[in-house]
Swiss-Prot record:
Gene transcribed to yield this protein: mnmC
Purpose of the protein: Catalyzes the last two steps in the biosynthesis of 5-methylaminomethyl-2-thiouridine (mnm(5)s(2)U) at the wobble position (U34) in tRNA. Catalyzes the FAD-dependent demodification of cmnm(5)s(2)U34 to nm(5)s(2)U34, followed by the transfer of a methyl group from S-adenosyl-L-methionine to nm(5)s(2)U34, to form mnm(5)s(2)U34.
Stated name of the protein: tRNA 5-methylaminomethyl-2-thiouridine biosynthesis bifunctional protein MnmC
Gene Ontology biological-process entries: methylation; tRNA wobble uridine modification
Short name of any one Pfam family annotated for the protein: DAO
Swiss-Prot/TrEMBL catalytic activity: 5-aminomethyl-2-thiouridine(34) in tRNA + S-adenosyl-L-methionine = 5-methylaminomethyl-2-thiouridine(34) in tRNA + S-adenosyl-L-homocysteine + H(+)
GO MF, any single term: flavin adenine dinucleotide binding
SUPFAM superfamilies linked to this entry: FAD/NAD(P)-binding domain, S-adenosyl-L-methionine-dependent methyltransferases
Length: 658
């Protein structure tokens, strides 16, 4: 999943231009890089005319092999801003095996000062770009860049999108033959929308023939600069003599899109993220929150930890966490550092032999700029407090004030926050969903998104989802002169964060039985014991043992989790009709019945984030919007399906328990 080299290895010529050491090739023409990009990719795909012809609310999807320095993307974005109507949107999806480091990207793009107004916002958001799918939102969501970091033949088969124009870039076929294969071109054809176009800088005969065989009609056209000819073409359709692509499974299909109005039930991280992603796409959103303010339950802690609990084996959950971490980390760039969040890093202590072994596996699987091992003296120096163990350090992690993130997300002008609205019943009337609290109708819209954690089980459509509540309590301790030295979040079984507004947060307990949210002295004592295991030195610096337990401040809330620890994100189906429609799967799970899924039209969910909501909820808002808008998914298809609500009904059918 992770490239052997985390970043491109570059040499720079005497004019400051980058050259790849791995492929021994240049990133762009030394004489006319911009002119060449515009001629080969912009003009051959007729992007000026096509952007100008877009309607308000319409989107255009460009796919690219080889992001490189981002020059093609920036030129496309510049033209889109010049030609497209204000309400149109651009999706740019690009695969890159060896992404440039932020410093190298900044150095390379400095060569093009005329693109500075586009490269500057890209560079601001070019943080935490690691393996897999990485979504970067620009211009308030009008332009979305999704980078697929890794080998093209591993990433593109996982892409779910319909591409209107392909930029076939990458290094020259002779230098990088893996990017110019029949297998890769078949993926481009699978992803091509009807009428899709394609262009590339090479005019090599065998490349043209392979693209023709994949379903594109290619022709040579005059080049520019030192390139005599280039190739352009159109997608004619899947070739008749080629094996058909695997049939789409209807239970993971996309429901039809209707009117762009939505009710979001629940004003925590999941609800605010869902509302923000839809509002950025032109939706009118009503965000219903039963409390007086947003983020009053599990999303209301003063500090949450931006911490990646990864697997070395590339599981669906690990891929979700890696993509979600990057997305949230980029969103935090919009907030006030020090008060709303701090990228102080996270240190996970190797507190026993099993944890030390797990950390060693992770350090071998992931690049050092994501995580790296520190021995005990290094860890102690990094943390600024006495520690008994070394551990794994995540330099881009840190702490977040979740209510600040929620409030920023909900501040979009197309979002109306309706406080003191507790939805007790949903009714479907004349293709609209109505939210009721008894005798009073609170609001109505074409789409409802259930984002109220486990409380959504009160609604019949989501009552069978296996969501469970786990009580957690945090403790707040006043900062002291001695505790100011804590320089990073430190975790073992629990966590402690550097102070925010004069208070440290530590926690959090796990109670699977209690349904009472009154903070208890017993759990404060448990949190202090977890702090002792992290650092007895910090416990002493805080004077925590001298504080009466009944004087400690804190709060309790319910986490909401699923049995497989993945969130539940996507459209909801009618449970009984689903079991009847796909009953045959109980006899043969391999078949794909050609029967449409019995969707509950306009009913969606974003829930089950457990203790990872800071990392998974914001990107799940994007995933939900992609399902609704028929856009490129922000996650690998297998991960999106692993998060789909229908996964539980499918498992019951296949096991014969429906």
């Amino acid at each position: 999943m992770i490239p052997e080299l985390p970043h491109a290895q570059l040499d720079w010529d005497d004019q400051g231009r980058p050259r790849s050491r791995v492929f021994d090739d240049v990133y762009f023409s030394s004489e006319s890089g911009l002119d060449e990009t515009r001629h080969v990719f912009i003009e051959q795909n007729r992007l000026g005319q096509r952007f100008a012809a877009l309607a308000d609310g319409e989107r255009f999807v460009i796919g690219e092999t080889g992001f490189g320095t981002g020059l093609n993307f920036l030129c496309a974005w510049q033209l889109f801003q010049q030609q497209a109507p204000t309400g149109a949107r651009l999706h740019f999806v690009s695969v890159e095996k060896y992404p440039l480091s932020p410093a190298d990207l900044q150095r390379a793009l400095a060569l093009w000062p005329e693109l500075a107004s586009f490269s500057a916002p890209l560079l601001e958001q070019y943080v935490a770009v690691h393996g897999g799918f990485q979504r970067i939102v620009l211009e308030g969501g009008r332009v979305i860049l999704t980078l697929l970091i890794g080998d093209a033949l591993e990433q593109l088969p996982q892409l779910d999108a319909q591409v209107d124009a392909w930029f076939l870039d990458g290094f020259a076929p002779a230098k990088n033959p893996d990017m110019w294969t029949a297998e890769l071109f078949a993926e481009l054809a699978r992803l091509a929308a009807p009428g899709s176009t394609i262009s590339t800088f090479t005019s090599t005969g065998w490349v043209r023939r392979l693209l023709n065989s994949a379903g594109f009609k290619m022709k040579r056209t005059p080049g520019i600069g030192h390139k005599w000819e280039v190739l352009r073409g159109e997608f004619l359709g899947w070739p008749e003599d080629a094996p058909a692509p695997a049939r789409a499974r209807p239970w993971f299909a996309r429901p039809a899109l209707g009117e762009k109005t939505a009710l979001v039930i629940g004003g925590g991280l999941a609800g605010c993220a869902s509302a923000a992603s839809l509002a950025a796409r032109g939706w009118q959103v009503q965000l219903l929150e039963r409390h007086a303010e947003l983020a009053r339950e599990a999303s209301g802690n003063p500090q949450g930890v931006l911490y990646l609990k990864l697997s070395a084996h590339g599981t669906a959950l690990s891929q979700m966490i890696l993509s979600g971490f990057g997305y949230t980390r980029r969103q935090l760039e919009h907030l006030q550092r020090g008060q709303d969040w701090d990228g102080c890093g996270v240190l996970q202590l190797a507190f026993n032999a099993k944890e030390a072994e797990r950390q060693a596996q992770l350090a071998a699987a992931f690049p050092a700029d994501l995580l790296h091992l520190l021995d005990q003296p290094q860890a102690q120096a990094r943390a600024g407090i006495g520690l008994e163990h070394g551990g794994l350090f995540y330099p881009e992690g840190g702490w977040v004030h979740p209510p600040a993130l929620c409030q920023w997300q909900a501040s979009h002008p197309r979002i109306q926050v309706l406080a003191h609205r507790e939805v007790l019943e949903l009714r479907r009337v004349d293709e609209q969903w109505q939210a009721w609290d008894g005798d009073r109708m609170l609001a109505s819209a074409a789409v409802v998104i259930l984002a109220g954690a486990a409380e959504i089980k009160r609604f019949p459509a989501s009552a069978d989802l296996p969501l469970k509540r786990i009580r957690g309590q945090i403790t707040r301790l006043p900062q002291t002169a001695q505790s100011q030295s804590l320089a990073t979040v430190v975790c073992a079984e629990g966590y402690v964060a550097p102070a925010r507004l004069g208070e440290h947060t530590l926690g959090a307990s796990f109670d699977f039985k209690s349904q009472d949210l009154t903070p208890t002295s017993a759990e404060h004592a448990g949190n202090l014991e977890m702090l002792r295991e992290i650092s007895s030195d910090l416990l002493q610096r805080l004077g925590a043992e001298q504080l009466p337990l009944d004087s400690l401040q804190g709060r309790a809330a319910f986490r909401c989790t699923s049995p497989d620890y993945l969130p539940i994100v996507g459209p909801l189906a009618d449970p009984l009709a689903f079991a009847e429609t796909y009953a045959a799967l109980g006899k043969d799970a391999r078949q794909v019945p050609d029967l449409p899924c019995p969707w509950l039209d306009g009913l969606y969910i974003n829930s089950g984030h457990g203790s990872r909501g800071l990392i998974t909820a914001p990107l799940s808002g994007e995933l939900l919007a992609a399902w609704l808008e028929n856009e490129p998914l922000p996650l690998p298809r297998s991960v999106a399906e692993a998060c789909h609500p229908n996964r539980f009904a499918l498992r019951r059918l296949i096991r014969g328990k429906a």
